[in-house]
Amino acid sequence: ESDYSLSFPHPKKVRGREIDTLGYLISNHNIRRSAYDSIKHFDNVNFQTGQGVVKVTTDAQKTTVTLENGKVLTAKVLIAADSRFSNTRRQLGISTDMHDFGRTVMVFRTEHTLPNNETATECFFYGRTLAFLPLGDYMTNCVVTIDSHRAQEILGLSREQLGAEMMRMLSNRFGEMKVISDVHSYPLVGVHARSFVAERSALIGDASVGMHPVTAHGFNLGLAGADILATVISEAHACGEDFSSQEVLKRYERKHMPHTLFLFHGTNAIVKLCTNEQTPARLLRSAVVRLSNNLPPVKFLISRQLTGF
């Protein structure tokens, strides 16, 4: 293990506008609440909560979705965003490139006595990866990734023991740490759909790309995909085109997929290098980190990928 670090300076400009940060971290429940509040007043939005999709069919005229309660919905276009293990995607006949990392991710929130300086920190240790994501000066979201057969080493700890373990792993950088939430865990599987569209259908969010969390960029890709698809459909509708046609939906795929493929496979390659404990891999990653740290163009390219397309 090495205490050498790769750091990224604040970017100055993205897409022609001034910025002073790589990004912001926002709790998921706040995003969901804001999304709901932004559309709940629209009369043409109908929420079907607590109902799973049991059947999906498409034809030349429409898409049809059958819910668990037996209700049947029809539309010109079906947009699926039902997780990286999407049942809808499977029913549409879209295959995926899937990589099971054999690891378990655990997420929990902590409070601490020393500030995090609003800086995200990622630590690659042998056998586990730690990410510390600032939610406030003295509040940090912790993400622990560990081989699945060793997950109980973390899941079996009390809150007090877990806080002490984080302090040890961080060498007390945040001072005394206190776990203030439950520990949530899930298997780590990366997924990239081989197509983002099918007949009268499109995939967005994790149904299209489920990223490794090391870049904290998966949600951003989901937002980008939704924005690109909405723009493509709106422009086609304004021009009098059939926005549900394959020709139109393929425009979304052509605009979005090249970027997601680069990030998906590039991230997986980095993770493989950083978690390989063989001696050649250790030497290579040490050289890569040191080289990258001293090549501003490389840092700029990485920052650009994480802040804008």
Predicted regions and their residues:
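C-terminal helical "tail/cap" subdomain of flavin- and related membrane-associated enzymes
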Residues: 231-309
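Short, solvent-exposed loop/helix junctions and linker helices
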Residues: 24-29, 156, 223, 278
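Conserved FAD-binding catalytic core of PHBH/FMO-like flavoproteins
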Residues: 62-64, 72, 77-183
